[in-house]
Structures are given as structure tokens and as C-alpha cells.
From Swiss-Prot:
Protein name: Imidazole glycerol phosphate synthase subunit HisF
Record localization: Cytoplasm
TM regions (residue ranges): none
Enzyme's top EC category: lyase
Length: 253
């Protein structure tokens, strides 16, 4: 039986970790390499770094963060944000990341998924999907540019297409739930999980240990659950979440 993964997410801006609530207000949560080390010691299975720097300087700083993190971490980590070309992927992976995550760039140019998958293997390519439920469409729709622009893709169709093109994993964020701490979007996660053959990481909405249980248990069956603020501000710890899951019979490392 495959163990379920708990993944802290670190949003990095100009070399510092920050966390927004519903993609807007930002608080400073510290040094990325120190935090990564802390989470490794806490028993995190993986980490995700999302580079939200807009500047070229910020992007260069991110390469340094990746190199330093790779030198101190034993667990795998993924880097996303600003990856638009195969060369961008090469730089991040050569700096020491295990996987790259693409979002807006993949929707703008879907062949990017295939290029990365052909060159590095599907296991290195994560497609991140930001989805919001639309009453008008009666389903979850995909948004780009940090949740600002609505696309014509439903989350289910885009996840299927991303996998067809070579994505090895889907990182699925519910924009409705993001930062709310009221639980993951179980309907969205289950729908995408059932539509694709690759692992799905649920993101957006974790507030308590039981929220991880809800999304990882058999009913929804996400492969991994990601959270940021509840870990950064020490509202709960990776170790506590895993202890809770073990007690509930969920297989964790």
C-alpha cells in the first residue's frame, strides 16, 4: 500500500517565504532554507517551493535557494513559478530540484508539458491547477496568472489533457478554499482523482489534522495533501498530522 504524503508549501518572494490568504494578503514566514530544514526534521515527505517573485533578481535568488536547499535536504522537492521554457526547467532541475511545477505557462503553451516530459521523464513534471467552482458552468473552472484569469477549461478536462501530454502528477488547488482553513475541496479533489491515472496532490483549505484525513481517506483518496500557513505559523505540525492519520489507519511514512 502506497503511503500518503504530507507536503508543506513555501511561497517564496525575492528569496523569503511568504503566505497569502486567498492569493492576496501576505505575511512573512521566514527563510526558505531554514524552513525547509525544519520541515525535513518534522517528517515532511516532500516540499513545494512556489517562486512568486516578479523580478529577474528574484528568479536568480530562487536558483540560490534551490542549490542551498538541495545541499541540506534529504527529501524530494518541487519548484514552480516562472517556468516557461525547457531551459527554465533545466536550470531548476540542475540546481537540485527533483521536480518542476508548471501552471499558467502550460495553459498558454501546452506543448511545454510534453517537452519537459520527453526530456526529463513524466516523474519530473507536475502540472499545477488553480480551480474555482463556477455556478454558471456547473463545474470547477481553471484560472491562470495566480487566480486572476478564468480559462475555458474545466479542472477535470485540463487535468486529463495535462496527463495525456505527459504530466506525472497534478497539484490541485481549490481557490474557493485557499487560506480559509475550513477543509480541502473534497468534491473537486475526488472528481480529478477519478479522472486521471497519476497522483493528485490536494491543496487549499487545510486548517486541522482531520482535514488531511478527509482528503486522504478512501472516500476521496488523494495521494498527498499540501498546506502552508498552518505549518508555517505552527498551528499544527507535520508530525502531529501524521500521528492523527496513523491513529485513523491511514498509511504514512
Amino acid at each position: 500500500m502506497l503511503t500518503k504524503r504530507i507536503i508543506p508549501c513555501l511561497d517564496v518572494k525575492e528569496g523569503r517565504v511568504v503566505k497569502g490568504i486567498q492569493f492576496v494578503s501576505i505575511r512573512d514566514a521566514g527563510d526558505p532554507v531554514e524552513l525547509a530544514k525544519f520541515y525535513d526534521e518534522q517528517g515532511a515527505d516532500e516540499l513545494v517551493f512556489l517562486d512568486i517573485s516578479a523580478s529577474h533578481e528574484g528568479r536568480e535568488t530562487m536558483i540560490e535557494v534551490v542549490q542551498q536547499t538541495a545541499a541540506t535536504l534529504a527529501i524530494p522537492f518541487t519548484v514552480g513559478g516562472g517556468i516557461r521554457t525547457l531551459d527554465d526547467m533545466k536550470r531548476i532541475l540542475r540546481a537540485g530540484a527533483d521536480k518542476v511545477s508548471v501552471n499558467t505557462s502550460a495553459l498558454e503553451r501546452p506543448s511545454l508539458i510534453q517537452e519537459g516530459s520527453d526530456f526529463f521523464g513524466a516523474q519530473c513534471i507536475v502540472v499545477a491547477i488553480d480551480a474555482r467552482y463556477s455556478e454558471e458552468d456547473g463545474t470547477w473552472m481553471v484560472y491562470t496568472h495566480g487566480g486572476r484569469n478564468k480559462t475555458t477549461w474545466s479542472a477535470i478536462d485540463w487535468a486529463k489533457e495535462a496527463v495525456r501530454l505527459g504530466a506525472g502528477e497534478i497539484l490541485l488547488t481549490s481557490m474557493n478554499q485557499d487560506g480559509e482553513k475550513s477543509g480541502f475541496d473534497l468534491g473537486l479533489t475526488k472528481a480529478v482523482r477519478e479522472a486521471v491515472s497519476v497522483p493528485v496532490i490536494a491543496s487549499g483549505g487545510a486548517g486541522y489534522a482531520e482535514h488531511f484525513y478527509e482528503v486522504l481517506a478512501e472516500e476521496v483518496d488523494a495521494d498527498a495533501a499540501l498546506a502552508a500557513s498552518i505549518f508555517h505559523y505552527k498551528e499544527t505540525s507535520v508530525a502531529q498530522v501524521k500521528e492523527y492519520l496513523r491513529a485513523k489507519g491511514v498509511a504514512v511514512r
